[in-house]
């Protein structure tokens, strides 16, 4: 299994990049969606875009990120007691919660019941970027080792 470690590590990183792309892009779509009139052609188009991004890119990318991450943890050795790993996992937990919120907000748009402003979506769009920076620094620098 160790001989495949770099392949699994690559798959984990590719999956995480795809997931992050969705986490960063979906709130931007929501910014535009706040400007669309309910029931308009733009509203319908954005709903399709949001659904496909979530179902066909973000959800599979999140799942594969976890699968390959667990495989890597198994090969590399369980490091859960290391402080850097706990910080990384906290950042990942925030990303998972954010992913769930994005899914809920998509449903709100689909029902015509969005209550958030474009400013709100612009601000929350920073959450995945901050979590990504934390996770990358923890994995590469391991500042608490």
Curated annotation (Swiss-Prot):
Compartments where found: Cell membrane
Pfam family of the protein (one): UPF0093
Example of a GO MF term: protoporphyrinogen oxidase activity
Catalysis: reaction(s): protoporphyrinogen IX + 3 A = protoporphyrin IX + 3 AH2
InterPro entries, sorted: HemJ-like
Names of required cofactors: heme b
EC number(s) on file: 1.3.99.-
Major localization listed first in the record, in broad terms: membrane
Transmembrane segments annotated in the record for this chain: 6-26, 61-81, 83-103, 123-143
Family stated for the protein in its record: Belongs to the HemJ family.
Complex formation: Homodimer.
PANTHER family associated with the record: PROTOPORPHYRINOGEN IX OXIDASE, UPF0093 MEMBRANE PROTEIN SLR1790
Protein name: Protoporphyrinogen IX oxidase
């Amino acid at each position: 299994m160790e001989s495949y470690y770099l392949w699994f590590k690559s798959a984990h990183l590719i999956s995480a990049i795809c997931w992050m792309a969705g986490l960063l892009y979906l709130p931007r779509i929501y910014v535009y969606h706040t400007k669309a009139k309910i029931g308009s052609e733009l509203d319908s188009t954005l709903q399709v875009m949001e659904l496909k991004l979530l179902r066909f890119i973000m959800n599979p990318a999140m799942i594969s990120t976890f699968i390959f991450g667990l495989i890597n943890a198994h090969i590399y050795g369980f490091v859960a007691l290391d402080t850097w790993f706990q910080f990384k996992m906290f950042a990942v937990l925030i990303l998972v919660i954010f992913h769930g919120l994005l899914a809920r907000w998509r449903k709100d748009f689909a029902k015509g019941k969005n209550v958030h402003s474009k400013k709100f979506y612009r601000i929350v769009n920073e959450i995945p970027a901050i979590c990504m920076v934390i996770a990358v620094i923890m994995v590469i620098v391991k500042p608490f080792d």
